[in-house]
């Protein structure tokens, strides 16, 4: 009987935990009853109430395994550590405790994996969220798809079922900040996609803030490609050509048609502001790449596990 591993990061999620675990257990009692499973919950130093709930769940269900981290390492590092601790023939890399990625899609992921695909990717074709956030994500996915060195589908998510042979390659990666949703694409092109609606959160509140989304997006772009450098270079070349052309035009226009150069001050100020902004943008990207290289050169920081339950 084949085994499926499911990884769930957790931080102060006492309101959603019981339902999250129940949904998975029900699936393997019914639709997926020909498979064994382990549900690895990676807790990022939550409050005592959340930890007590985790202990209670694990005591009643041996399929639920809990890793209690000594501190909050964030969802990415704790999830990757959970993947390292998994033993299944296939691993669901990320199953959120808020169930916005619907557990009802897991049987479809498993069915496609059994057809021989190395991994099956969940794609969020629809999103139940406000307009501005939806458009921001669309722009990010457009950049990710078009600048990545691998062929990555639009709206790719971490909700992926990955075969053990690919997982074994992934966990060898020495990366302090792995971008999990694109890792499998580094090792195989043999995949298929499953589309679904990313649902509005119904239980509890999100522990992720806007800065966390920005950090994840920057990390993702840096991880998958050096194209931002080339993109900035192209912008720089185009802006330089435009500014030189406009400068020559302004010079000749003022020489031959008017004598009052003060009238050009607004244009000068706008130009200075635009180019200053571009310089800061370039420096920002350089800083991000330099910081990324610095973090990779440093010895990898492992997750300090305070306690493991049911392992």
Regions found by a protein language model. Give the residues of each.
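Conserved donor nucleotide-binding strand/loop of the catalytic core
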Residues: 40, 51-80, 84-85
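Hydrophobic helical membrane-anchoring modules
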Residues: 182, 186-311
């Amino acid at each position: 009987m084949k085994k499926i591993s499911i990884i769930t990061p957790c931080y102060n999620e006492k309101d959603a935990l019981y339902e999250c675990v129940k949904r998975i257990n029900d699936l393997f009692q019914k639709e997926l009853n020909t498979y064994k499973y382990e549900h690895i919950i990676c807790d990022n130093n939550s409050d005592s109430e959340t930890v007590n709930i985790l202990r209670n769940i694990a005591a009643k269900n041996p399929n639920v395994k809990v890793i209690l981290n000594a501190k909050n390492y964030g969802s990415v590092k704790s999830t990757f550590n959970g993947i390292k601790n998994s033993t299944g023939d296939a691993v669901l890399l990320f199953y959120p405790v808020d169930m916005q990625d619907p557990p009802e899609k897991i049987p479809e992921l498993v069915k496609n994996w059994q057809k021989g695909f190395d991994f099956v990717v969940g794609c969020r074709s629809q999103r139940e969220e406000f307009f501005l956030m939806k458009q921001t994500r669309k722009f990010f996915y457009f950049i990710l798809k078009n600048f990545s060195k691998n062929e990555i589908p639009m709206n790719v998510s971490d909700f992926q079922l990955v075969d053990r042979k690919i997982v074994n390659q992934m966990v060898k990666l020495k990366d302090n900040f792995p971008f999990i949703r694109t890792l499998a694409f580094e090792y195989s092109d043999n995949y298929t996609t499953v589309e679904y609606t990313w649902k509005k959160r119904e239980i509890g509140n999100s522990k992720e803030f806007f800065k966390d989304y920005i950090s994840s997006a920057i990390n993702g772009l840096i991880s998958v490609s050096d194209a931002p450098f080339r993109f900035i270079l192209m912008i720089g070349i185009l802006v330089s050509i435009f500014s030189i052309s406009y400068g020559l035009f302004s010079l000749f226009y003022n020489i031959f048609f008017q004598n009052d150069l003060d009238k050009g001050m607004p244009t000068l100020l706008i130009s200075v502001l635009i180019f200053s902004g571009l310089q800061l943008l370039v420096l920002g990207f350089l800083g991000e790449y330099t910081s990324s290289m610095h973090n990779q050169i440093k010895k990898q920081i492992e997750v300090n596990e305070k306690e493991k339950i049911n392992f």
